[in-house]
Structure formats: structure tokens, C-alpha cells
Swiss-Prot record:
Domain remarks in the Swiss-Prot or TrEMBL record: The C-terminal disordered region undergoes liquid-liquid phase separation (LLPS) for the formation of a membraneless compartment that concentrates mRNAs with associated regulatory factors. CAPRIN1 molecules in the condensed phase are neutral. mRNA-binding promotes phase separation. Moderate concentrations of ATP enhance phase separation by reducing the electrostatic potential of CAPRIN1, thereby promoting intermolecular interactions.
Residues modified to Phosphoserine: 10, 113, 333, 341
A single MF term (Gene Ontology): molecular condensate scaffold activity
Gene name of the encoded protein: Caprin1
Protein name: Caprin-1
Compositionally biased tracts (Polar residues): 431-443, 572-603, 641-655
Length: 707
């Protein structure tokens, strides 16, 4: 007995939790059945849903009663196990414990079965409702199609030809009689009435919709002396005759035949009109290609592809560029409106000269960008009035200098426009002030522009050769000749535009592609002509950047004071000593004797400190002048450039003994360290008068006397 009771007790405990789930499941099924009953289903579906809800409710109640009864029996069983005495009724109830448990299990199984059945019924009802909905939609669409067809037929009955065809018939059998046509006409007035402004539009067409609905339903209501059913039969007979279908296809066939007949004519017209647009397109492509190539190296305001009569104005010297990329010859030459009075030396084919000049400009867009930190300090400072000018020239001839434009390198051009540089009748041998770093490593060919041998025409164009003299590393392996007409750009003065406080305009065209790392204002010793000629042949093994392409030499002239202002640097030489500077800016000293210093101080172009006297500016130069321990010429600061991997120069070592004392960086000399005046190692700061700045990232140069 105890074992049985314990087993039954355990069974009751194990079977206790499912009844609530079962009851909740029945409630869920009933809740699921409730929405299904709300669907617009048929009467059978609604009855089934309602019956299933009632069955599930009865089973749920029976399960709850059995659970309560089983709970009481479990309580009696526990009391009996504790030794309490029970009355006879309680003992009878405990004896029926197994029967109650079996009934509870049966009720749960029955509930699960009815729940599954209810779910199947719900799915069936939903499918039926969906099918009925689709059927209703199809019926409605069919009725709507019938209404549209009826309106079309009633509209076509107003045509006399259609009425005649319907009365005669296609095969001799009449489709409609005159009486039937009149009935349809009366019905047409009902379904498509004239607008009555006394009624609202909704009310007026509501009556028309009722007539159409009754016609579609085929009701026996009287209308127009007949019934809707009779009218529906008449309309269906017209639909079945396929009269409007055949007529519609026949009309389409005529349209297609007409279109097919007109198609060849259109094709012939298009074929005749095709050659002209093709020619126009070809001409446009040529003009566009010419504009694209020419706009790379000149300003848009100076471009004009239409003026081909100025081809004869391309009288410039022949430019030979080794290792150059060949470009296609240009079809049209741009117009050059500005006059330039230069002296032509050699005459050749204008097309060949223009091609070579453009090849030179295409390769002179160098990638170097060794800009000094001192050049980036004061970008918006105006030109210091203390910047000294070079020796003047005799203003007998004026050479107009146009604005140097290089749109591929810098977005702005800060050069002054149309500065006039007076030139003496005799050609002068002046240093070429450019930003090319190979200017300090090249050999001795001179830059000798000639201005008095012949008189160039007034409209000699040099705008196409106004590019920056910044050479690419690919060009440094061979010598190249630069035309003399392209060199006056180095005399461009920048006094009218804001410059750096250091006096160097890094935004100028020579400084846009690569920034100079040398100071152009080193003192040049007064040497005689034989020494210069001797020194010119001394470094022939080095890299030669030749700027002398003239077939004959011209005489040299002297620079006069207060006329020529340069941006990179100003040179003050002695009035009584003509100084000859090679085109590569190098003047090596004598190998046997010391370097004689000139009595004339040399200034750089950087600003002087405020408050100083005008005559004492030479003393503030930290690395120029006779008082700062400067010994030797340019060769004292020339690096060997012994096949540096980043420079691209392939120079051989020079014959003269030179000391470079740890001052080489990729083959480029960085900058002169700011020196001092006569009073100490560092003098007054230049520029805006601020404290001296450290030489950021630049190795210090130790100046040594060259023997």
C-alpha cells in the first residue's frame, strides 16, 4: 500500500504541471479560432469554428475538475503516510486515486487531439476564405471588364458606319435590328447622362451605377420599355459577333502597312544626312585635341587656336633636348599678342622650332621640391625696401617680360606682369638666376643673350617658352641647349607682389617646380679673361647644362645700378671691375693662390633688421661679405655629387682639391647657415626682426678657406 500510494503520489506530481498547459493550450486554440470566425467565411466555416470553440471549452473545464480532484487525493495520501486516521469517505476517495489519474491522462490526450483538429480546421477555413476572396475578385474584375466593353460598344454605336454594319451583318445575317439599336441608345443615355449641375456628381453617377449593376446582374426590372435581362442578352450578342475585334485588327493592319511603307523613306533620308555630321564631328575632335595639348603649357587667356597666320612669329633658337619624349606636332599655333623686342640669331622652320620648344617645356616640369624652411616663414610679407638692386643698364632698348605662367606646377602666379628690363646695345654675360640645383654643378658654358646684333620683330612670341627652368632628373644625364629667347624670364622682378621677408619669392615660376637650395649671391672674384677660359675647360667631364645656343659670341656689357631688380638675389659688383659670371653660376678659384676678396660688399636678397642704416646692410650678411671669414668662390661649396641615388646626377670628381666637411645630402647643398656680422658668431636677425630661428632639418655648413 505505501508503495502504491507513493507511486501514485509521484505520478500525480509528475502529471500535475501539464494540465495548466493543457488548459492554456485550449484557451489559445479558442483564441485562435475566434479570429478565424471573424473572417468573412461562409456559414459552414463559421459553424465549424464556433463548434470547435465549444468543444475545447468543455474539455478544458473537465481537465480543471480532474486536477482539483487529484490534488485532494494527493493530500489524503500524504496524511495517511504520516499516520493520521481518515474517515470512510476519505478512504474511498483514496481508493479511486488510480481511476482519477487515468481519467486525467485521457482528458489531456483528448485535448491535444481536439487542438490539432482545430488547427487543421482553421487552416482549411483560411484557405477557403482566401479562395473565395480570389473568386470574388475575379468576378469583380470580370464585371469591370464587362462594364468597359459595354461603354465602348455604346460609344461606337454613335457611328453611322458601325450601325449600318451591325444591321447588315458581316455574313449577311444582321446582328442588331433598328429597334434594338434604339433601345441601346436609350440605355446609353441612362449610364452616361449629361452633366446636371443641379445634382452633385456623386449622386448623378450613383444612379448610372445602379443601372449598370442591374444590367450586369440581368435583373427583370423594366427599363427603357424592356428589362435589364433583355438588354444584357442584346449586349452579349454584340460581344459574341466579334465585329469590333475584326474591325480593330483591320485598322491596325492598315496602320502597320502605312508605317512599313514610310519606313524606307525615312531610312534613305537618314542615310543621306549621315556624312555631314561625321565630318563635323571629325573637325571638332581635331580642335579639341589641339586645345588640350596647348593648354598644358600656357595660360588660357593667351590661347587662340584660330590665328594660324602667326606661324612666322616662332623665330626662336633651335632647342635640342636629349632623352626627350616625342610629342605629336600641333595643328594650330596659339596667338601671342604681347610684343617682345629680342634679337634673333638663327632662323629655322617655325613648326620645328615650336615642336622643340614644347618638348623642352614638357620635360622641364621637374619633380624637385627641396624648399627651405626659411622660405616658408613669412608668406604674405611685402617686399622689403631694403632689397638692393643690381647694376643698371643703359635704357637704350626695352625687353618686355611677360608674366611667367606654369599652371601645371602651381595654382597661383605671383610674378609681376610686364616688367621692363633695360638692356644695353651690347649683349652681357650675366648669371642665370634659376631654381635648378644643377646650376651649381654644371660646367662653364655661358648664357649669352644677344640684344643688339639684329632687331627682332615687335610681335616675337616668347609666351610659349615662359616655363620654369626646373629640369627633371631624367635630363641631367646629357646637355641641353636652351634658347636665348627663353632666358629673360630670370630677370622677372617681383617688386609689385608680396614676397617673403627673406627676399625670395618661392611662388615665382622658377621656384614652383623645385626650390633652390643655393644662394645665388655669392661674391664673384674679379678674374681676367684667360683665367675664365682656362677654368671653362677644367670641368668638361662634369654635367654640362648649356645655355648658349647662339652661333656667334657677342660682346659683354656691364650692369648699371638701380634698374635690374631680381627676386632671388641682387648682385652688387664694382663699377670699375667687369665681372664675368658663367651661366652655371660657378667661379672656381685659382688652384695655386688664395682667393682675392673684393672691396665691394655683396648682399643677399633677404631682409635686413629694422632700424639699420642703409650703408650698413652689407655688414648684417651672415654668410656673405668680406668680414665673415668667407674664403674662396663657389667651388668651396660645391659637392661632389658622386652618383647619389636620389639626385640623378652622374658627375665625376673634380680635379681641384676641395673640402666638403660632412656637407652632402643626396647630392644637394641645403642652405647656408645664418652667419653673423662683424661683431660675433651671430648678428642681428634678419627678416621681420624676430629672434633667430634654428636651422630646422638643415645640416650646418662649415665654411673653410679653399687653397
Amino acid at each position: 500500500m505505501p508503495s502504491a500510494t507513493s507511486h501514485s503520489g509521484s505520478g500525480s506530481k509528475s502529471s500535475g504541471p501539464p494540465p495548466p498547459s493543457g488548459s492554456s493550450g485550449s484557451e489559445a486554440a479558442a483564441g485562435a479560432a475566434a479570429p478565424a470566425s471573424q473572417h468573412p467565411a461562409t456559414g459552414t466555416g463559421a459553424v465549424q469554428t464556433e463548434a470547435m470553440k465549444q468543444i475545447l471549452g468543455v474539455i478544458d473545464k473537465k481537465l480543471r475538475n480532474l486536477e482539483k480532484k487529484k490534488g485532494k487525493l494527493d493530500d489524503y495520501q500524504e496524511r495517511m503516510n504520516k499516520g493520521e486516521r481518515l474517515n470512510q469517505d476519505q478512504l474511498d476517495a483514496v481508493s479511486k486515486y488510480q481511476e482519477v489519474t487515468n481519467n486525467l491522462e485521457f482528458a489531456k490526450e483528448l485535448q491535444r487531439s481536439f487542438m490539432a483538429l482545430s488547427q487543421d480546421i482553421q487552416k482549411t477555413i483560411k484557405k477557403t476564405a482566401r479562395r473565395e476572396q480570389l473568386m470574388r475578385e475575379e468576378a469583380e474584375q470580370k464585371r469591370l471588364k464587362t462594364v468597359l466593353e459595354l461603354q465602348y460598344v455604346l460609344d461606337k454605336l454613335g457611328d453611322d458606319d458601325v450601325r449600318t454594319d451591325l444591321k447588315q451583318g458581316l455574313s449577311g445575317v444582321p446582328i442588331l435590328s433598328e429597334e434594338e439599336l434604339s433601345l441601346l441608345d436609350e440605355f446609353y443615355k441612362l449610364v452616361d447622362p449629361e452633366r446636371d449641375m443641379s445634382l452633385r456628381l456623386n449622386e448623378q453617377y450613383e444612379h448610372a451605377s445602379i443601372h449598370l449593376w442591374d444590367l450586369l446582374e440581368g435583373k427583370e426590372k423594366p427599363v427603357c420599355g424592356t428589362t435589364y435581362k433583355a438588354l444584357k442578352e442584346i449586349v452579349e450578342r454584340v460581344f459574341q459577333s466579334n465585329y469590333f475585334d475584326s474591325t480593330h485588327n483591320h485598322q491596325n493592319g492598315l496602320c502597320e502597312e502605312e508605317e512599313a511603307a514610310s519606313a524606307p523613306i525615312v531610312e534613305d533620308q537618314v542615310a543621306e544626312a549621315e556624312p555631314e555630321p561625321t565630318e563635323e564631328y571629325t573637325e571638332q575632335s581635331e580642335v579639341e585635341s589641339t586645345e588640350y595639348v596647348n593648354r598644358q603649357f600656357m595660360a588660357e587667356t593667351q590661347f587662340s587656336s584660330g590665328e594660324k597666320e602667326q606661324v612666322d612669329e616662332w623665330a626662336v633658337e633651335t632647342v635640342e633636348v636629349v632623352n626627350s619624349l616625342q610629342q605629336q606636332p600641333q595643328a594650330a599655333s596659339p596667338s601671342v599678342p604681347e610684343p617682345h623686342s629680342l634679337t634673333p640669331v638663327a632662323q629655322s622652320d617655325p613648326l620645328v622650332r615650336r615642336q622643340r620648344v614644347q618638348d623642352l617645356m614638357a620635360q622641364m616640369q621637374g619633380p624637385y621640391n627641396f624648399i627651405q624652411d626659411s622660405m616658408l616663414d613669412f608668406e604674405n610679407q611685402t617686399l622689403d625696401p631694403a632689397i638692393v638692386s643690381a647694376q643698371p643698364m643703359n635704357p637704350t632698348q626695352n625687353m618686355d617680360m611677360p608674366q611667367l605662367v606654369c599652371p601645371q606646377v602651381h595654382s597661383e602666379s605671383r610674378l609681376a606682369q610686364s616688367n621692363q628690363v633695360p638692356v644695353q646695345p651690347e649683349a652681357t654675360q650675366v648669371p642665370l638666376v634659376s631654381s635648378t640645383s644643377e646650376g651649381y654643378t654644371a660646367s662653364q658654358p655661358l648664357y649669352q643673350p644677344s640684344h643688339a646684333a639684329e632687331q627682332r620683330p615687335q610681335k616675337e612670341p616668347i609666351d610659349q617658352i615662359q616655363a620654369t627652368i626646373s629640369l627633371n632628373t631624367e635630363q641631367t644625364t646629357a646637355s641641353s641647349s636652351l634658347p636665348a629667347a627663353s632666358q629673360p624670364q630670370v630677370f622677372q622682378a617681383g617688386a609689385s607682389k608680396p614676397l617673403h621677408s627673406s627676399g625670395i619669392n618661392v611662388n615665382a615660376a622658377p621656384f614652383q617646380s623645385m626650390q633652390t637650395v643655393f644662394n645665388m649671391n655669392a661674391p664673384v672674384p674679379p678674374v681676367n679673361e684667360p683665367e675664365t677660359l682656362k677654368q671653362q675647360s677644367q670641368y668638361q667631364a662634369s654635367y654640362n647644362q648649356s645655355f648658349s645656343s647662339q652661333p656667334h659670341q657677342v660682346e659683354q656689357t656691364e650692369l648699371q645700378q638701380d634698374q635690374l631688380q631680381t627676386v632671388v638675389g641682387t648682385y652688387h659688383g664694382s663699377q670699375d671691375q667687369p665681372h664675368q659670371v658663367p651661366g652655371n653660376h660657378q667661379q672656381p678659384p685659382q688652384q695655386s693662390t688664395g682667393f682675392p676678396r673684393s672691396s665691394q660688399p655683396y648682399y643677399n636678397s633677404r631682409g635686413v633688421s629694422r632700424g639699420g642704416s642703409r650703408g650698413a646692410r652689407g655688414l648684417m650678411n651672415g654668410y656673405r661679405g668680406p668680414a665673415n671669414g668667407f674664403r674662396g668662390g663657389y667651388d668651396g661649396y660645391r659637392s661632389s655629387f658622386s652618383n647619389t641615388p636620389n639626385s640623378g646626377y652622374t658627375q665625376s670628381q673634380f680635379n681641384a682639391p676641395r673640402d666638403y666637411s660632412g656637407y652632402q645630402r643626396d647630392g644637394y647643398q641645403q642652405n647656408f647657415k645664418r652667419g653673423s656680422g662683424q661683431s660675433g658668431p651671430r648678428g642681428a636677425p634678419r627678416g621681420r626682426g624676430g629672434p633667430p630661428r634654428p636651422n630646422r632639418g638643415m645640416p650646418q655648413m662649415n665654411t673653410q678657406q679653399v687653397n
